[in-house]
Amino acid sequence: MRPRTLLLPFLALTGLLLTLLTAPPGAADSGAPPVKHSKYAGYLFAYFTGEGTADGEQIRYALSRGNDALHWRELNAGKPVLTSTIGEKGLRDPFVIRSPKGDKFFLIATDLRMYQNSSGSWDQVQRHGSKSIMVWESTDLVHWTDQRLVKVSPDNAGNTWAPEAYWDDELGEYVVFWASKLYADDDPDHKGNTYNKMMYATTKDFRTFSKPKIWNDPGYSVIDSTVVKYKDEYYRYTKDERDPSSSSPCSKFITGEKSTSLTSTKYDFVADCIGKGAMDRGEGPTVFKSNTEKKWYLFIDEYGGRGYVPFETTDLASGKWTPSTDYQLPASPRHGTVLPVTQQEYDRLLAAYPSSPTSVVDATAKHQKGYSIVTESASKVVLPMEPDADLRGLAPKLWVGEGATLSPKSGTRRDFRTPQKYTVTAADGTKRTWTVEAVRTRSPLLPGLNADPDVHYLNGRYWIYPTTDGFQGWSGTKFKAYSSKDLVHWKDHGVILDLGPDVTWADKYAWAPAIAERNGKYYFYFCAEQQIGVAVADSPAGPFKDALGKPLVAKGGALKGQMIDPSVFTDDDGQAYLYWGNGHGYVVPLNDDMVSFDASKVQDITPDNFREGSFVIKRKGTYYFMWSEDDTRSENYHVAYATGPSPLGPWTKRGTILQKRPEYGILGTGHHSVVNTPGTDDWYMVYHRFALNGPGRPGGDGMHRETTIDRMEFAADGTIKPVVPTLEGVKPVRR
C-alpha cells in the first residue's frame, strides 16, 4: 500500500491515559477473566464480501462501536483497504494475528479469485489451485509491507484454503492451519477423488514454515477451522463439509472440539450442528472473546444467505451457542477475523480510513443515548443525547482523517442548544463545513422493542397495544398493553394475551393488534399465524379472553393476500368497521357483537402500492384512510393516505405523510396509528421505526423496531401535512 502519514484524532488525553494507550499490548488472552477496565477499546473486523463483484475478493475493514462487538462501522467507505496484485489476484478469508510481544501484526489470506471463475470452477480450484498463502506484516494495522506469496502446502495439494494462525507458547511458534485436498503421488494431474483435510505447519516469521502435517482428518471433508484458548484448553470450530444426508444431519454446519495441545490430532468432541436452527448453512467461523466480560462470540457465515450471523456463549465447554438478537454488521461480510484493538489503534484506524479527506469520521459526547449519526452526503453529525442532557457546555470529540485539521478543535466546549459549525481542512487545503447537532432524545416511547402500535384514548388515558418485537421471523407469542396520561410517561400493564395458554388455534406470530370499545367491553383484535382473532375483556388492561375459539378472519379462503393487521374504526353513528390485509386491503362493517360480520359485505379497497397497516380516522366530516407501503424490513417503509366521503370510500390517494429521515438515523418508519386529544384538534401519530443504535441498545432492522410518536397536523384545506419524524418525540400533553 501507499505509505500514509499518521494522524491521531484530536483528543485531549491525560498523561495517564496516554501511558495506558501507548504501552505495547500483549497477545489477546482469550482466557483472561473479566476486567472492569479493559486495555482494549474495540475490535477490528477484516473480511471480504464475496465473488459477486470485481472487488469483492479483496480485504475490507470495519471497526466496532467501542467495545460493542455486535455493532460496526465500515472503514474506507466500504472499499477495499488491501488488494492483491500477485498470484490469483484475489483475497479471501483474511486472518489477522497480533504477535505475542504486541509489536507486530501478520495478515494472511487465501490466494483465490472466483469472480467470473477467474481461477477456474470450484472443482478446478480444488484440484489445481494455489499451494500458497498471502502474507503481509504491519506494526500499526494501517501501514503494511508489500504482500508476499508463501508456499505452505505439499506438492500433492490441490488447494490451500482459509489459513489461520495461533501462537503456541509451548512451541514458541505460530501454528498456521488451513484446508487442502491431498492427491495420491501417482496422480500428478489430480484427477482422482479426495476430500479436504485440515493441515498445519509452524513458523516464527511467516517466511519459513515447517513441513506441513495433517491436523484433522475425520474421514470426510472439513474446512475453515478457527481456534480460541481458554485456560489450558484450545477450542476448535470447523465446518463439516459433507453433503447433508440422514447419516450426516450436521453437514454444512460447525463442529466444536477441544484439546490441551494445539497441534493434537485427537481433539475431544464438544458439540456439532452449531448454527443449525438459526441459519440455513454455515461456514467460515471466527471466534473471539469479549473485551469486557466472560463471553465469547462466534460469527458464522451463512453463505448464499445473510453472510455472517453472530452467536454467543458464556461457557465454551457447554457447546451451546445462542444467536445474538441485536446486531448490525458491515454490508455483506464474508469469512474474516475479529481482532481486539487498543484505544490508540482504534483511533489510528478511524483516522486512516475516512470516506473523504474532509470527512468527520465519528463523534462522541458525554450523556449520549445512542451512537452518533454521521451523514457524509449532508456534512452533518447528529448526537442523540439523553433527555435531560445539558447542552450548554457540551464538548464533543470529533475524529477527522489523517492530515486534516478541525476548527474549532475537538473537545472545545460550545453551546449546543443550537447546531454548531465545524470546518475540516484537508492536507491539500480543501475545506468543508460540517453541522453538528445535539438532540435530546425522548424516543423510543415504550421501553424495549415494540412495533405496529395501535393507540387509542380510553377511560381518560392513552393506551398503546404493540407487537412485542425482537424475535427472529417475528415469532413472538405475547401481547402487552401500555397506558399514559400525557403521551410521554407510560405504564406497562404486562401481558394481556399469551397465545400459548390463551388461544387454542394458534401458538405463535403474535402481530399487529388493535383495540375497540363498546358498551363497557373492550375488544382486542390480534394476528396469530397469519389469521385474525378477537378477545374480550372488561378493562383495557385485560386480561383478555379469546371470544370465539377460532379465527375471526381465517387464512386459506377466497381473499387474496395475508389475513393480518386488523384495525377498527367506529363512526359517529356507532357503526364499527374492521380493516385488515397485507398485499390487499379489506373493510367490512362489524356486527353489533363486535366479534362477527357478514362475509358478503367484505370490500376490497386496495390502493396503489398498498402493503399493510390500515388505519382510519374522521375529521370535520372527512374520512382518512392510511396505510404502509414497501416492506417493514426496508428502510424505505413509509405511510401514505387517501381521503373519502365514508368509511368505505371511495378513496382518493393523497400521497406520503411519513417517511425515513436518515440524517437522524430514523429509518423504516411505518405501521402507524393516530390519536386525537379529546376536545382539541391536536393529533398525534404513533409509529415504529428501526431501533436506534447505542451502547447496549439493539441495532435496528425489520425485526428490531421501536415505537415512537410525533405530532400530525392538517393544512387549511384538510390535507395532512407531512409528519416530520424526530428523535425528540413530543412533550407531555395536558388536557
Regions found by a protein language model. Give the residues of each.
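Secretory targeting and sorting signals
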Residues: 1-28
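Short, intrinsically disordered low-complexity segments
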Residues: 1-3, 91, 212, 412, ...
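Residues at the start of alpha-helices and the adjacent loop-to-helix junctions
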Residues: 4-7, 20, 195, 388, ...
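Hydrophobic transmembrane signal anchors and adjacent membrane-proximal interface regions, especially
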Residues: 6-8, 21, 204, 397-401, ...
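Small side chains
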Residues: 15, 256, 363-365
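Carbohydrate-active catalytic/glycan-binding domains of CAZyme proteins
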Residues: 29-357, 438-735
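Beta-rich interaction/scaffold domains
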Residues: 355-441
